[in-house]
């Protein structure tokens, strides 16, 4: 084809996509922000500086729960592990990785993964805002205290940029 194509409006499935990696290779058992590939630990105020406006359109998570213990009796609750994708420290997408908010869902040590997608425009950001990922671990105390130790955490966030 010898001419340029011009579209007035949004093309479904169109847009430039970017993929941002976050992770932690060491062990941790409390809430923390994940690092970027350069090893710099992100915070609620420091993450990937987004080069242009767009939307968060997908998230993929893989973790290894290297150690899991419950709260002992009477209810034997397990820690709740949640991954949160944030823009400038504000939650955009939250997904349970293991357990339940009330501690009632049990799980074993081992690898766990999940992924989720959403439509363009659901969770948006502006150029210059910061993208970061936080892993939140909530423990429960009864006769003992539940705990989960994570290692080898990898999170990939897909963003679709506006034209």
What would you call each of these model-derived segments?
Residues 141-156:
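Extracellular carbohydrate recognition
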């Amino acid at each position: 084809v010898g001419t340029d194509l011009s579209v007035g409006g949004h093309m479904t499935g169109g847009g430039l996509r970017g993929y941002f990696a976050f992770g932690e290779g060491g062990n941790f058992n409390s809430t923390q922000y994940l690092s970027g590939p350069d090893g710099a630990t992100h915070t609620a105020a420091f993450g990937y500086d987004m080069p242009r406006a767009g939307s968060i359109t997908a998230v993929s998570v893989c973790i290894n729960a290297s150690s899991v213990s419950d709260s002992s009796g009477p209810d034997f609750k397990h820690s709740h592990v949640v991954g949160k994708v944030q823009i400038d420290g504000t939650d955009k997408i939250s997904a349970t990785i293991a357990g339940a908010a009330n501690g009632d869902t049990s799980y074993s040590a081992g690898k766990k993964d999940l992924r989720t997608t959403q439509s363009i425009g659901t969770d948006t950001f502006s150029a210059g805002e910061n993208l970061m990922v936080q892993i939140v671990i909530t423990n429960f105390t009864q006769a003992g205290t539940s705990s989960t130790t994570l290692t080898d955490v990898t999170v990939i966030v897909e963003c679709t940029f506006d034209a």
